Amino acid sequence: MHVPGTRAKMSSIFAYQSSEVDWCESNFQHSELVAEFYNTFSNVFFLIFGPLMMFLMHPYAQKRTRCFYGVSVLFMLIGLFSMYFHMTLSFLGQLLDEISILWLLASGYSVWLPRCYFPKFVKGNRFYFSCLVTITTIISTFLTFVKPTVNAYALNSIAIHILYIVRTEYKKIRDDDLRHLIAVSVVLWAAALTSWISDRVLCSFWQRIHFYYLHSIWHVLISITFPYGIVTMALVDAKYEMPDKTLKVHYWPRDSWVIGLPYVEIQENDKNC
C-alpha cells in the first residue's frame, strides 16, 4: 500500500531543485540542464588539484602512508558531487556533497591527527582511533539521511576542533616553513568562508549589483586550501611520527615562483654527521 508513496519520495530526492538550499547565482541562465552554471564548473579545480597532489606527494605517500591516495580521491569526489549538486540542486546532490566533505575530514583525522590529541581511552593507538572515527562518521552519515542538519553540526564541530589544534600547534612550532603554511592555510580558509557566508547572508545585495560568483569563488579558494592544508598536516605529523626524517617543502611548478602548490619531499637525516 505504501510503495507508490515511497517511489514518489525516492524520485523526488533526484529531482531538480528538490533541495531546500539555493545559492545566490540565478538558475538556468546559461543552460536548461545546469541550474547554477558558475557554481557547477568552478568545481573543476578539485579535479585538477586532486590528481596533481597525488603525483607531487607520491614519494611521501610511499614512505609515510598510502592513505594519502584515499584522501585525494575523496577530495575529487567532493568536486564531482558538488558539480552534481549545483547542476541539479537536488536533495540527493546536497547529501552527497555534504557527506563527502564529512568523510574527507574524518579520513584526515584518522591519518594525521597527532596522538597527543587522541582521547585517553584509545591509549595512543592510531588503529583504535581510526576505528572510533570511522564508526562515528558512519553513524553521522546514516543520521544525515534521517535529519540532514546532523551533518551541519558534525562539520561545524570538526571545524572548531581543527582551529583549536592549529592554534595549539602554531604556538609550539619554530619551523618557518610550517608557520608560513599554517598562516597561508588559515588566510585562504578565512577568505573562502567569508565568500560562502557573504553569498548566503548578503545575496540580495549581490543580486542588485549583478555579482553572482561568491560561491564559485568559495569553490576555487577552498580547492587551493586543500594542498596547503595537506602539507601542513604532513609536516605536523612528521614532527611526531618521523622525528628521524626531515620534510622539505617545495612548490609546484617552481620554488622560485611567488604562487605555487606546496608539496613535501622526505629527506633522510645523516646521523653520522
Swiss-Prot record:
Cofactor(s) the protein needs: Zn(2+)
GO BP terms in the entry: cellular response to calcium ion; ceramide catabolic process; keratinocyte differentiation; regulation of lipid metabolic process; response to alkaline pH; sebaceous gland development; sphingolipid metabolic process; sphingosine biosynthetic process
Pathway: Lipid metabolism; sphingolipid metabolism
Alphabetical list of Pfam families matching this protein: Ceramidase
Top-level taxon of the source organism: Eukaryota
Loss of function: phenotype: Homozygous knockout mice are viable and fertile, with a normal lifespan but display several postnatal skin phenotypes. It includes an increase in total ceramide levels in the dorsal skin, tail epidermis and dermis. This is associated with hair shafts and sebaceous glands abnormalities, cyclic alopecia, a progressive loss of hair follicle stem cells, hyperproliferation, inflammation and abnormal differentiation of the epidermis and results in increased transepidermal water loss and reduction of fat content during aging.
EC numbers: 3.5.1.-, 3.5.1.23
Tissue expression notes: Highly expressed in skin. Weakly or not expressed in other tissues. Expressed by granular layer of interfollicular epidermis, sebaceous glands and infundibulum.
Positions that bind Zn(2+): H86, H215, H219
Residues exposed to the Lumenal side: 1-36, 148-149, 199-215
Membrane spanning residue stretches: 37-57, 73-93, 94-114, 127-147, 150-167, 178-198, 216-236
Binding-site list for Ca(2+): D22, W23, E25, N27, E36
Catalytic activity: an N-acylsphing-4-enine + H2O = sphing-4-enine + a fatty acid; N-tetracosanoyl-sphing-4-enine + H2O = tetracosanoate + sphing-4-enine; an N-acylsphinganine + H2O = sphinganine + a fatty acid; N-(9Z-octadecenoyl)-sphing-4-enine + H2O = sphing-4-enine + (9Z)-octadecenoate
Summary of activators and inhibitors of this protein: Inhibited by sphingosine. Inhibited by Mn(2+), Zn(2+), and Cu(2+) in a dose-dependent manner. Slightly activated by Ca(2+) in a dose-dependent manner.
Keyword annotations from UniProtKB, A to Z: Calcium, Endoplasmic reticulum, Hydrolase, Lipid metabolism, Membrane, Metal-binding, Sphingolipid metabolism, Transmembrane, Transmembrane helix, Zinc
GO cellular component, one term: endoplasmic reticulum
Entry annotated with the keyword Ubl conjugation: no
InterPro entries listed in its UniProt record: ACER
Membrane topology note: Multi-pass membrane protein
GO molecular function, one term: metal ion binding
All ranges on the Cytoplasmic side of the membrane: 58-72, 115-126, 168-177, 237-273
pH dependence: Optimum pH is 8.0.
Stated role: Endoplasmic reticulum ceramidase that catalyzes the hydrolysis of ceramides into sphingosine and free fatty acids at alkaline pH. Ceramides, sphingosine, and its phosphorylated form sphingosine-1-phosphate are bioactive lipids that mediate cellular signaling pathways regulating several biological processes including cell proliferation, apoptosis and differentiation. Exhibits a strong substrate specificity towards the natural stereoisomer of ceramides with D-erythro-sphingosine as a backbone and has a higher activity towards very long-chain unsaturated fatty acids like the C24:1-ceramide.
Family: Belongs to the alkaline ceramidase family.
Protein name stated in the entry: Alkaline ceramidase 1
Record organism: Mus musculus (Mouse)
Classification lineage: Eukaryota, Metazoa, Chordata, Craniata, Vertebrata
